[in-house]
Curated annotation (Swiss-Prot):
One BP term from GO: cell wall organization
Gene: mtgA
GO-annotated molecular function: pentosyltransferase activity; peptidoglycan glycosyltransferase activity
Domain of life of the native organism: Bacteria
Protein's UniProt name: Biosynthetic peptidoglycan transglycosylase
Organism: Caulobacter vibrioides (strain NA1000 / CB15N) (Caulobacter crescentus)
InterPro entries: Glyco_trans_51, Lysozyme-like_dom_sf, PBP_transglycosylase, Pep_trsgly
HAMAP family per UniProt: PGT_MtgA
UniProt KW keywords: Cell inner membrane, Cell membrane, Cell shape, Cell wall biogenesis/degradation, Glycosyltransferase, Membrane, Peptidoglycan synthesis, Transferase, Transmembrane, Transmembrane helix
Length: 229
């Protein structure tokens, strides 16, 4: 009986290691070199009947305006941090504890880890896995690859994923031809692309678009996007 229990525990530990350590490492290394074909969210939305328009484009086929705009809108310290912006997390925690509208403090790296490898949700298990995958992609991918995958996996509306699909659907151009103004309109609907609209935006999105445009000027001036240039 003792031998059986020890063997069972050993097998369970091995399985746990494979699931939590080896499996994620292998997946991250694999996606360092090949485009992620689909994400869990894409599958979920497709099952919901929203369709799936996703066209991968390498970094050099996407307008340099888009990463600058996304850094301005989502993560001004993207080139500085190692996956986590602890100051932003603290501000988000204080904001949420005060009873105001829930605010996230996720970096682009964290969002990429969530988008590519995990399911939507706010459970502690998912957040823990998100942190683990964030460490892995920061270690094995580097900033350019993280941004490349991020731009290709963002949800931009019902069934619309990535820069190319969004550029074609909303503006009738390729991702390589996106202007800063168009990129700002895309960024303005994040993180609620099913709620807010790129075309005929409401007051909130219009105001946010202008704010992002101004912030992008600072990103360019201060070299905050140099790591993906």
């Amino acid at each position: 009986m003792g031998r059986f229990v020890r063997r069972l525990l050993r097998n369970l530990l091995l399985a746990l290691f494979l699931v939590l350590v080896a499996g994620p490492v292998v997946a991250v290394i694999l996606y360092r070199f090949i485009p992620p074909p689909v994400t869990p969210l894409m599958v979920i939305r497709a099952v919901e009947g929203r369709g799936l328009d996703h066209r991968w484009r390498p970094m050099d086929k996407i307008s340099p305006a888009l990463p600058r705009v996304l850094i301005a809108a989502e993560d001004a310290k993207f080139c500085e941090h190692r996956g986590f912006d602890f100051e932003a997390l603290q501000k988000a925690y204080e904001n949420n504890e005060s009873g105001r509208k829930i605010r996230g403090g996720s970096t682009i790296s964290q969002q990429t880890a969530k988008n590519v490898f995990l399911w939507p949700g706010r459970s502690y298990v998912r957040k823990g896995l998100e942190a683990w995958f964030t460490v892995l992609i920061e270690t094995f991918w580097g900033k350019k690859r993280i941004m490349e995958v991020y731009m290709n996996s963002i949800e931009y509306g019902s069934g619309i994923y990535g820069a190319e699909a969004a550029a074609q659907r909303y503006f009738g151009v390729s991702a390589a031809k996106l202007t800063q103004a168009q990129s700002a309109r895309l960024a303005a609907i994040l993180p609620s692309p099913l709620k807010w609209k790129v075309i005929k935006p409401g007051k909130y999105v219009a105001k946010r678009t202008k704010k992002i445009g101004k912030a992008t000027g600072a990103v360019r001036r201060d070299g905050l996007a140099d790591c993906v240039a």
